């Protein structure tokens, strides 16, 4: 399990700690764009996991159609969009070009389990 997050390092780590995500994700598998040097949709962030974990099935779960899915789609990852329930900070416009579209859409994170092989 890995995490790709865009933003300032301190801000994103405060969020990660507040959510208790390090109980589920190893710290070295958390990429914060400012510290890593690249953000989404740069291919380097996706390649990091492909190199570290070769010969795996890759799933990308996100909510920002403008940058979350385009590179993951290009790289053959299975993409899943967690649909906005009214709390997103950015507009979730699904009327984007096909390459920006997720393969799947879910209302709840628990629904992802039925997608993963």
Stretches found by the model and what they are:
Residues 4-117:
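Asp-based, Mg2+/Mn2+-dependent phosphohydrolase catalytic module
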């Amino acid at each position: 399990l890995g995490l790709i997050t865009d933003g300032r390092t301190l801000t994103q780590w405060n969020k990660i700690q507040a959510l208790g995500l390090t109980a589920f994700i190893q710290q070295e598998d958390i990429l914060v764009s400012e510290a890593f040097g690249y953000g989404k949709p740069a291919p380097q962030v996706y390649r990091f996991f492909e190199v570290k974990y070769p010969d795996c099935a890759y799933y990308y779960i996100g909510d920002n159609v403008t940058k979350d899915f385009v590179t993951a789609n290009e790289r053959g990852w299975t993409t899943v969009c967690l649909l906005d329930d009214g709390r997103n900070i950015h507009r979730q416009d699904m009327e984007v070009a096909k390459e920006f579209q997720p393969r799947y859409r879910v209302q709840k994170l628990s629904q992802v389990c039925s997608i993963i092989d």
